[in-house]
Every structure is written in structure tokens, then in C-alpha cells.
Amino acid sequence: PDYLCMDGTIPRARLAEVLTRIDELSSEFNLAVANVFHAADGNLHPLILFDANVDGQTEQAMAMGARILEVCVEMGGTVTGEHGVGVEKLDTMCVQFNAAELEQFFASKRAMDSADILNPGKGIPTLTRCGELGGLHVHGGHLTFPEIERF
């Protein structure tokens, strides 16, 4: 068996509620979960158990992991606690942050790495990526950053 270790944070007062939601997701995805966490600081590490030798289970585990991180955000937490974003959590960053907030991330990155040579494509999702995932919010019929090509 294989496992996927997630890393999200939640307000400590919502731990029981989040564990209940993770249990519901476990049933929905038909994958077992071993919940480990730092209860004192609200840092969760659900271990999603699956068999990579079974067609589709790896993708199913990844989808379940993304849903767990969405639950963390819904509960007032974040998509990452101590393990960072990298590429694994780029899509869930679109759930937690809006376009203006992501632009602040990019502004900081440009200030320190104007040539974009330090871990390009990692840590901050592009606005195009968020748009493709449905993470961009259209308000009053106005699309933010209309110059970005979309399909």
C-alpha cells in the first residue's frame, strides 16, 4: 500500500468538525485515512491510503487530498502548514487566495527573482491556472485580468 501525506492547518476549535468531514470524504472516495496531526497548533497530516498498482487510485487519492485542503480553507485554515506549496498544492492555492492576493505573491517574487530562475512554476499558481480551474472570481460581469488568454 501507498499513502499520500497531506499538510493543512485549521483553527483548533474546528478539529472535530474537520475530522468528521475527512471521514465523510474517506467514505465518498472509498479510501482509508489515518489522521495524524499536531492538535495543539491545528496542523493536520491526514494520510490517504491507496494502492498505486490499482488503475486510477493515485489520481483518486490526489483528488481526495485536494478536497481535504479545500475543507481546511472552508473551516478558516490554510492549504499548507509546514511543508510548503511546491507544485502539489498550486491548484488549491486558487481556492484560498483571490487574484489580488496572488498578485502580491508575484510582486514579492519579482522583487527577489526578476529573471524567474528560482523554482519557476512552483509555489504560486499563475492567474491562467486559476482561471482554468475555475478559481477566478468574476464580479459584476467583469473578468479580472481580461488580457490573460483563456480557453
Give the location of each predicted region.
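Conserved glycine-rich FAD pyrophosphate-binding loop
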Residues: 1-151
